Amino acid sequence: MSGTILENLSGRKLSILVSSLMLCQVACFLMGGLYAPVPAGHQTVVGIKCRDVPGRQNDTNFFLYSRGNGACKSLQDMDIEQDPLKMANQLVYVFQMPLPRDNRTLDYSRWQQNLIGVLQVDIAYDSSSELREPPKELQLTIDTRLAYRNKKDADTDWKLYAHSVEQRYLDCHAAHVGLLETLYTCDIIPLFELGALHHNFYLLNLRFPIDTPKRMNLQFGHMHDLTLTAIHQNGGFTQVWLLLKTLLFPFVVGIMIWFWRRVHILQRSPALLEYMLLYLGGALSFLNLPLEYLTLSIEMPYMLLLSDVRQGIFYAMLLSFWLVFAGEHMLIQDTPNKSTIRSRYWKHLSAVVVGCISLFVFDICERGVQLRNPFYSIWTTPLGAKVAMSFIVLAGVSAAIYFLFLCFMVWKVFKDIGDKRTSLPSMSQARRLHYEGLIYRFKFLMLATLLCAGLTVAGFIMGQMAEGHWKWNEDIEIQLTSAFLTGVYGMWNIYIFALIILYAPSHKQWPTMRHSDETTQSNENIVASAASEEIEFSNLPSDSNPSEISSLTSFTRKVAFD
């Protein structure tokens, strides 16, 4: 048995490898901090009030727009206030995106990937009316129409993208109390989400139909102002992100091929940990595959859902690997049989399975439906919000249980190592130094695993944070959010790259010896190596299971049984 590269690699070569990987990690942080802008940008668009054209309310191919030839005439607030019915069923709120800047017409780029719209509603109640304040759960019915056009199209050539009649529930509070009316400001509500930003210009028309028999929009007084916040991924961040993926993808695929070839050279079946390393590398390669380049030429509204699925597969595989990685280094096994996922780890992985299924169901309920209707949101109804929150809480509880259990397993491994180190003084000096070196390397790798796990949890939280926590200061030279995201992404690749290298079978072959000559010959080899400039922590021949890949585990189990 030749052991792993972690056990056989010399101290100098291991230092060079670790230093190189650390430099790559620093480069990933600097790439995001110095060259990438914030991951998401936004633009605030105030709704332009236009008078609807009679007879065209039900024509989904008719659009009112505020800029360009044939633009609608904006209505003044005074005109609306003087109307006894506040121009009910006559108003259309127009949002044309993106807004011009410095008298220049701006357009969206396909590098910006996606577009999310949230709506701020301000409503007013007349002091003379019977209804003077909104109810607790105010239901608002909105006729939403989203259109698009491209640079080469005429100003009037708007095409329908999506149409839907949606209900939203408002939670409002008084902002200004006047003699004639009271103004209420409502919490932001989600309006739409586009998984692909394929066109240059977008147009949104909102109508608030009032229908007495259906009791539609009878309780919200009259609309005062509407403000749309359009959130998009920054094109500069997308370019840096795809550059990082493009650079990392071939390295991970190449190291996987190299690793599997070394495993197949051995005269044994692959161990469970070797299978898990291969699966983990495959999940990372699937995540690294820069499919986003296709969105530059093809409209792919399902890219957000696909990205979530890819990241979910990677998270599930990474979390499962950490449990198996710690479990396979337990020094006293419950059963002497070969480890399998089903026999030893189904209880350990139950929290991972529950959490991943919860997030997957939530994602399908949200973004899966948005492929047909971008205005849909599971958060719009009280029941839907409770169901969505229950899925998120369930996933969060599973994540907390998982992390605590992982820390317990690592602590148990360290405790077992400490207990078994009491047998080291009875060994020869060369053999004791050999195993002390292995224990030191393994502890360092375990601590790196815990650090990676902690940063992964932090990165997941930052990725799920609402982009309402936007950085409004545009003068920050180093964007911590971008640096953290690219740094964590690079850390995943570097960590898995290092694991695949260090746990690959070593090419060093040691001669087969009789048991009586084992200790003498091994000590002579190690002492001879120790006298050289670089000490090789070679694997000592033993009668352990030939499927073992770690001589540290083999040693401690042998000591325990002895």
UniProtKB/Swiss-Prot annotation:
Positions in the Lumenal compartment: 35-239, 292-311, 366-390, 463-482
Main location: membrane
Residue numbers on the Cytoplasmic membrane side: 1-13, 261-270, 333-344, 412-441, 504-562
GO terms for MF: Wnt-protein binding
Any single GO BP term: segment polarity determination
Superkingdom field: Eukaryota
InterPro entries assigned to the protein according to its UniProt record, in alphabetical order: WLS-like_TM, WLS_GOLD, Wntless
The keyword Protein biosynthesis belongs to this UniProt entry's keyword annotation: no
Keyword set includes Transmembrane helix: yes
Keywords recorded for this protein, A-Z: Cell membrane, Cell projection, Developmental protein, Endoplasmic reticulum, Endosome, Glycoprotein, Golgi apparatus, Membrane, Postsynaptic cell membrane, Segmentation polarity protein, Synapse, Transmembrane, Transmembrane helix, Wnt signaling pathway
Membrane topology of this protein: Multi-pass membrane protein
Positions of transmembrane segments: 14-34, 240-260, 271-291, 312-332, 345-365, 391-411, 442-462, 483-503
Gene Ontology cellular-component terms listed: cell projection; early endosome; endoplasmic reticulum membrane; endosome membrane; extracellular exosome; Golgi membrane; multivesicular body; neuromuscular junction
Pfam families, sorted: WLS-like_TM, WLS_GOLD
Residues the record marks as carrying a glycan: 58, 103
Localization (cell): Presynaptic cell membrane; Postsynaptic cell membrane; Cell membrane; Endoplasmic reticulum membrane
Assembly and interaction partners: Interacts with wg; in the Golgi. Interacts with Vps35, a component of the retromer complex; wls stability is regulated by Vps35.
Family per similarity comment: Belongs to the wntless family.
Function summary: A segment polarity gene required for wingless (wg)-dependent patterning processes, acting in both wg-sending cells and wg-target cells. In non-neuronal cells wls directs wg secretion. The wls traffic loop encompasses the Golgi, the cell surface, an endocytic compartment and a retrograde route leading back to the Golgi, and involves clathrin-mediated endocytosis and the retromer complex (a conserved protein complex consisting of Vps35 and Vps26). In neuronal cells (the larval motorneuron NMJ), the wg signal moves across the synapse via the release of wls-containing exosome-like vesicles.
Protein name, as recorded: Protein wntless
Gene: wls
